[in-house]
Amino acid sequence: MPPYRSRTTTHGRNMAGARSLWRATGVKNEDFGKPIIAVANSFTQFVPGHVHLKDMGQLVAEEIEKAGGIAKEFNTIAIDDGIAMGHGGMLYSLPSRELIADSVEYMVNAHCADALVCISNCDKITPGMLMASMRLNIPTVFVSGGPMEAGKAEVKGVKRALDLIDAMVIAADDHYSDGEVEVIEQTACATCGSCSGMFTANSMNCLTEALGLSFPGNGSMLATHSDREQLFRKAGHTIVDMARSYYEQDDAAVLPRSIATLEAFENAMSLDIAMGGSTNTVLHLLAVAQEGNVPFTMADIDRLSRHVPCLCKVAPAKNDVHMEDVHRAGGVMAILGQLDRAGLINTSLRTIHSPTLGAALDAWDISRDSCSEEAQLFYRAAPGGVPTQKAFSQSSRYEALDTDREKGVIRSKNHAFSTDGGLAVLFGNLAPEGSIVKTAGVDESILKFTGKAKVYESQEAAVAGILGNDVEAGEVVIVRYEGPKGGPGMQEMLYPTSYLKSKGLGKLCALITDGRFSGGSSGLSIGHVSPEAAEGGLIALVETGDTIVIDIPERIIHLDVDDAVIADRHARMEAKGAAAWKPQNRNRPISSALKAYAALTTNAARGAVRDVNQLERR
């Protein structure tokens, strides 16, 4: 059996100094020998998705200690992508994922912790912690802060649900008065929690359920609802049981790499496709898989996207549906249940809470006769409708569940929104290593699109062009040098896509970038173009007026320019020497921290992870 890692610091005469320090943190004589559980919290007052997490670490710690473990809490950083959006702050968002992964690894390994509870929520925090858990491969449980309630307001005489994207789009729409914009601003983000649509944060928290690393409801139970408290309490006692299983019974099946196998990643990606999750999930799943040496690639995503249907559309794809509605329809377990009925997932895999995913679905899929009364009550949890920054502050219930699988929020395969899924991988000369589009957010009329390129060397230039009416219907906006290396940091293009909507061009234009998109983006928005411009990708050679062909059903993205012309452009680019493959006339200060990130990062097709082997090749 593997020895408890913590005994490196708690046992033996030579560790008297370390034990003395442990005692100074509150460890008692009788505690030595118990498993030490690291509680990685991500509380910050900067982020609504994390503002309510301050006491969550101690809530988990309380349960750990009741179960016979020693709990030690620490914090990671957390960046709010919405606040960092549209200015230089967004350059730091994706690189923060690596910092979060490193910080968890550093704390856990430096102090020889035996197991880990990850309290995450927003965009880069869950992926960063997932990367760390696969790296460390010690017993781990994930529990997130939960989604915020959708805002509710009267807009142009119509009562409707609102979210962050509504505030952004409407603010740039001249048809709305300053007073109307202010009302929307004050109501769009009503409570603590991750933004209320199927954006990156909620997508990733849903995927932890499919990976088997969190409890049912982790991705959909509202942050404000009292039922969410049980997820934190379950995490505390479950992690102690898992630690004992591994260290005392030699049960390696409880380790992250044993749970999050290739088949589990395929389940997670199938869920993502079925629910039209954020395109960022592709980037993050690839990165997490690499940390665990799981051979999950863009080719797997392409394969799955061709036969997994779109069973659920949530904001921004469907403006009147938010995470609270997904929860009422049975949450992730209900979507997985429909995928299981269609024979599209593997339910023999273990989870942290059940011997198999199939057993979990029997208990938690509200469409099954075997679904427990506990689960049915759990999924009736409703929004409270009161602005708050306090977790567990209300206990409202819907009178009934949404079990309509024909026209409801979650559909069966026979009544799917589309026969292929909500995400697609496009290949072609413009993206030989792949690119990603959220098809759930694309209007059917533009699934095939041919247009002239309008090229911008940065997000800022694209925003100025769109707002300055430089972009016309039928054009393909190209935003380049915004990839992991070229940005650096791979900014989200939420403002360009939002402003295209504001200008009435959301269904009339396409946008292609080597950057990425917010989970709130929709429209014909194609990102993650690989290779990126800064590494010699063809996107760097596109010129304004070139014809671009996009065919989502055939998974094609093509620059329709003669090979001889492309070869000539390539030669002229190479002739620039040190200035080659760099943006022209872009004035952007780049800090040393970002330069270090750019020096080691890979492109989006590899998850934009660090490749330290680059140092050996220099």
From Swiss-Prot:
Membrane in keyword set: no
Gene Ontology terms: cellular component: cytosol
Pfam families, per database record: ILV_EDD_C, ILVD_EDD_N
The protein's name in its UniProt record: Dihydroxy-acid dehydratase
Coiled-coil blocks: none
Molecular function via GO: 2 iron, 2 sulfur cluster binding; dihydroxy-acid dehydratase activity; magnesium ion binding
Primary gene name: ilvD
Reactions mediated catalytically: (2R)-2,3-dihydroxy-3-methylbutanoate = 3-methyl-2-oxobutanoate + H2O; (2R,3R)-2,3-dihydroxy-3-methylpentanoate = (S)-3-methyl-2-oxopentanoate + H2O
Biological pathway: Amino-acid biosynthesis; L-isoleucine biosynthesis; L-isoleucine from 2-oxobutanoate: step 3/4; Amino-acid biosynthesis; L-valine biosynthesis; L-valine from pyruvate: step 3/4
Record lineage: Bacteria, Pseudomonadati, Pseudomonadota, Alphaproteobacteria, Sphingomonadales
Modified residues (N6-carboxylysine): 124
Residues reported in the UniProt entry to bind [2Fe-2S] cluster: 122, 195
Keywords noted in UniProt: 2Fe-2S, Amino-acid biosynthesis, Branched-chain amino acid biosynthesis, Iron, Iron-sulfur, Lyase, Magnesium, Metal-binding
Domain of life: Bacteria
Keyword NADP belongs to the record: no
UniProt xrefs under InterPro entries: Dihydro-acid_dehy_C, DihydroxyA_deHydtase, DiOHA_6PGluconate_deHydtase_CS, ILV_EDD_C, ILV_EDD_N, IlvD/EDD_N
